[in-house]
Amino acid sequence: MSYSQDLSQLHNPRLEDLIRIAYNNLPSDKRTHPWIGLSHGVKLLENNNELMQYLCAYGKMHKEKIVSALDAIREPRNSFSKKVTIIDWGCGQGLASICFLDYVRELGIVPNIEKVVLIEPSVPAINRANEHLCKYIGEDQILLVNKYINDVANDDIATNSNLVLHFFSNILDI
């Protein structure tokens, strides 16, 4: 099976499931050193193998960064039960948004997501981010902005939500 086929079989996925699927679909010569060829994680990803390599090499680190930031929020149940828009700058494969959704789910919070705005210049990466996020929320709640940061317009990120979460976990890439 392919990564996308394996992903389609998942129900209620978690980041760890995505990493496992990536590892299982990665060519064996890339499994032991998945970071090789990714320029320390800042390379714009160009193909399926690079997407899977990145997930294996850096997925857990992304979770640790996001969880550390979210743990600093007092009373997350009060904050994250409100209508929220997520703007994921340099989203790559959507890992920051996924980590947030995993985090609130682990707390037993059902987030009221108005929309998730995914901003990413790499076409394969933003398409994979969309594929990932569709497993978490409705496709109509996802807005893809395939641009570099300097090209993002106010209309691209406009929202009526009172709570807007900006994730900059991969901002160096864009």
What residue ranges belong to the model's regions?
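N-terminal auxiliary segments of SAM/dcSAM-dependent transferases
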Residues: 1-37
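Conserved class I S-adenosyl-L-methionine
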Residues: 83-92
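Short beta-strand element of Class I
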Residues: 114-117
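S-adenosyl-L-methionine
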Residues: 127-160
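Conserved SAM/SAH-binding beta-strand->alpha-helix loop
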Residues: 122
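Conserved SAM-binding loop of SAM-dependent methyltransferases across substrates and taxa
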Residues: 93-110
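Class I SAM-dependent methyltransferase Rossmann-like catalytic core
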Residues: 40-77
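A short SAM/SAH-binding and catalytic strip from SAM-dependent methyltransferases
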Residues: 162-174
